[in-house]
Amino acid sequence: MAVNTYNLLRKQSSSIMMRLLVLVLLLLPISLFAQQKHALLVGISDYPQYKISDASWSRIHGANDVRLLSPILSKQGFKVETLTDKSATHKAIEKSLKKLSQTVHSGDMVYIHLSGHGQAVEDISGDEDDGWDEAFIPYDAQRLYQKDIYTGNNHLLDDELNQYLDAIRTKVGATGMVYVVIDACHAGSSYRGEEDTDSVYVRGTDIGFSQSGKTYAPKIDKRGNIRVTSRPDMAPLYMLEACRSYEVNTEIKQENLFYGPLSYYISQELLTSTLSTDTNWIENVRKKIDKDTRLIRQHMVTESSR
């Protein structure tokens, strides 16, 4: 009789525990199971000016891109972090990328946007076929190599960015998605226009950052889509770039404000399209850029893992 009573109590206890477990799971926030959306937006307009003018970057309007895109992405459910002007130092960008790689989870979506100047950097490691790395220019990166003054430590090299992207893609896994937008340029002339006119604002420089004094000659690659390496356990990667390596990225004026053309047309597309695993929106952006007669000399480039 005692044994039967004991067994009955065990069954009742197990049943109660199971019900409690189900109740706890039901009470857990739905967000723990849903895909999380993360966005890091970096945009620089006003770079520091140095005594040596060749070390300084011209004024552009990268911060406008961030202000344009931030509310749109927030409305789509993204947790948005922004870094603009003085806050967009190399250290700050690196810190945000590292944090992103540590906080994302399997199945998450990540959107990274970089708006500012770009520059080709002489490849010291020897991993680039053409002898040049590509770099995004944070707020505290100078344009000119100067021994014992500035040697490029604040340039955000493509090698460095790719390391963080690999970590993020591995963390979110094959069910996640990673988008990267680079509204910069590595072949511009950095012409400084007047704020109250329709003067040309160009992102980037045609002067390579070189320790040896090497002259930069951009590689002529007319491909519009480039395949990047991947692994089965990694999230798909789609990287959008404002122009080909030998072209100039010219800002456009809309409603009395200047924007990077890639950023502007992404914002217009995302007013009606929701970022997801469906990548049709990318080609819609390309078509919008191609239709703009102000941009006939630049062509959007995509790099993708599939």
Q: Could you tell me what each predicted segment is?
A:
Residues 2, 23, 34-306:
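Cysteine endopeptidase catalytic domains of the caspase/legumain-like
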